[in-house]
């Protein structure tokens, strides 16, 4: 597994790749995270919105019970509403930027993850280094595909986030987050891995 640090995507010899594909390698699929899916499941926009909603409901309940004076509860609510709007907007913007700068590439030999807003990075993961792939589907039609790497291969959770499987800190797993048509991508991955060396596990 190799890592290549890039300064600009405009310099890519082939979109999403640090170098042109060898003649014997075939491009199977390219895609990016869905911004809404990434915002909800990686950046926690929904959880933050629910938190502020409950906080506002509590403030309104206190106002209705007379614990806050009428001229005081508005002063309590307005900053909370503004903070809620700023927090969700900021997280949504970060998710959108991350999705825009991310490109996942699958060939018949490897996976290539290009990601990073401030510091773009490209990572090549040969299919022969993948022990298993796990597919998770969501009701909005998007999904995640996480990869368990063979030892001693490791990735940094901090460097790869949010392109890692959630809650896997001790042995982080690279993950295609919030991709559209994930079942089809998983099938392409299964076929490519089977043709290359075989990949046990689910996808």
Predicted feature locations:
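Short, charged cytosolic
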Residues: 2-31
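A membrane-cytosol interface segment of integral membrane proteins
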Residues: 2-4, 139-203
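Long, distal/terminal scaffolding or interaction modules
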Residues: 23, 53-54, 124
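Residue-level signature of catalytic and energy-coupling elements of molecular machines
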Residues: 29, 111, 185
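Flexible glycine-/small-residue-rich
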Residues: 31, 108, 149-151
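Alpha-helical transmembrane spans
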Residues: 36-101
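Conserved beta-hairpin
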Residues: 87-132
């Amino acid at each position: 597994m190799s890592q290549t640090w890039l300064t600009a995507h405009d310099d890519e010899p082939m979109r999403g790749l640090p170098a042109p594909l060898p003649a014997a390698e075939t491009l199977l699929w390219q895609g990016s995270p869905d911004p809404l899916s990434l915002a909800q499941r990686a950046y926690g926009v929904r959880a933050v919105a629910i938190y502020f909603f409950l906080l506002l409901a509590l403030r309104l309940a206190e106002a209705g019970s007379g614990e806050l004076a009428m001229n005081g509860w508005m002063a309590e609510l307005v900053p909370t509403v503004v903070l809620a709007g700023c927090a969700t907007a900021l997280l949504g913007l970060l998710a959108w930027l991350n999705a825009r700068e991310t490109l996942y590439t699958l060939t018949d030999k490897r996976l290539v993850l290009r990601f990073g807003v401030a510091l773009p990075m490209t990572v090549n993961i040969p299919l022969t280094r993948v022990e298993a792939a796990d597919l998770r589907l969501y009701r909005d039609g998007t999904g995640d595909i996480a990869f368990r790497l063979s030892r001693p291969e490791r990735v940094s959770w901090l460097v790869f986030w949010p392109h890692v499987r959630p809650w896997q800190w001790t042995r982080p797993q690279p993950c295609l987050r919030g991709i559209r048509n994930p079942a089809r991508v998983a099938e392409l991955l299964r076929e490519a891995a089977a043709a290359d060396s075989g990949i046990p596990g689910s996808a």
